[in-house]
């Protein structure tokens, strides 16, 4: 039995991924305390057990708030759990291990919000107690909502700053582009429609191409052309340095929260 503790947006996204993969509804339980949310989960996942109490199980996904992880982990002491996947931001593996007596395999992961539509980018790190089977189990869950890479735990803060917070950077870019279109005379509706498709199309082109982002950029940047003028303005305003500063600030904050 696999218990997903926390039936919020990310927890329910993982359940959808599991059900779309090799897991059956009978193999999954969702643990959720909020009564209103329980009703919503029962409506969406008709054949999945939704409960306020964690059943005995050998596998757990921790999808609760970071501040609740230690308390929830302590409650798993007598549940028979042998492997845990935590997606709680900033909570170190050692903190989870110290809350549960015995030898438990703990994997810590950092997904991002596109996981809600099965297009997430996740990074994971395994504890010393993990074997190949534990790692494969965690990967299988995360692959249900997108892609996954393995990194050392100390790099998960950098992952948080880059891909964890990254969707917000992209959405801010979208806001700025829409506003720029309006400033040049387009209606907000037209500008919004163009920018949304711009981001979708460019992302798909990047994902499906064997070329680097730099190569793709240069292909659409003719010397002395319109794109070259726009790129020159971005470079002059230190666009790369601004992005680097944002990722650095988010990484630093992740480290602070993990102390």
Predicted regions and their residues:
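NAD(P)+-binding Rossmann beta1-loop-alpha1 motif at the extreme N-terminus of oxidoreductases
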Residues: 1-50, 59, 119-120, 182-183
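Structured catalytic cores of enzymes that bind and process phosphorylated ligands/cofactors
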Residues: 7, 30, 132-133, 243
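Rossmann-like NAD(P)(H) cofactor-binding subdomain of soluble oxidoreductases
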Residues: 15, 43-124
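Small-residue helix-packing motif on alpha-helices
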Residues: 28, 38, 69, 96, ...
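Internal alpha-helical scaffold of NAD(P)-dependent oxidoreductase catalytic cores
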Residues: 95-105, 121-159, 170-208, 253
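Short pre-catalytic strand/loop immediately N-terminal to key active-site residues, enriched for Gly-Thr
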Residues: 106, 156-161, 213-218
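NAD(P)-dependent Rossmann-like dehydrogenase/reductase catalytic/cofactor-binding core
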Residues: 196-259
């Amino acid at each position: 039995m696999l218990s997903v503790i926390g039936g919020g947006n990310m927890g329910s996204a993982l359940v959808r991924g599991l059900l779309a993969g090799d897991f059956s509804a009978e193999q999954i339980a969702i643990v959720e305390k909020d009564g209103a949310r329980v009703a919503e989960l029962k409506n969406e996942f008709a054949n999945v057990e939704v409960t306020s109490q964690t059943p005995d199980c050998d596998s757990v996904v921790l999808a609760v708030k970071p501040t609740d992880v230690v308390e929830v982990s302590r409650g798993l002491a007598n549940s028979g759990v042998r492997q845990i996947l935590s997606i709680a931001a900033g909570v170190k593996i050692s903190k989870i291990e110290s809350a549960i007596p015995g030898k438990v395999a703990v994997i810590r992961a950092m997904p991002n919000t596109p996981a809600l539509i099965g297009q997430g980018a996740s990074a994971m790190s395994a504890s010393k107690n993990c074997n190949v089977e534990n790692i494969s189990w965690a990967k299988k869950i995360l692959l249900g909502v997108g892609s996954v890479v393995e990194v050392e735990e100390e790099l998960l803060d950098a992952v948080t700053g880059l891909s964890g917070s990254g969707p917000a950077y992209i959405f801010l870019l979208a806001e700025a582009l829409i506003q720029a279109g309006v400033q040049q005379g387009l209606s907000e509706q037209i500008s919004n429609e163009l920018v949304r498709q711009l981001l979708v199309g460019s992302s798909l082109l990047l994902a499906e191409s064997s070329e680097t982002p730099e190569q793709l950029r240069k292909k659409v940047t003719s010397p002395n052309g319109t794109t070259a003028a726009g790129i020159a303005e971005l470079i002059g305003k230190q666009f790369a340095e601004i992005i680097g500063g944002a990722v650095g600030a988010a990484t630093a904050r992740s480290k602070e929260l993990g102390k």
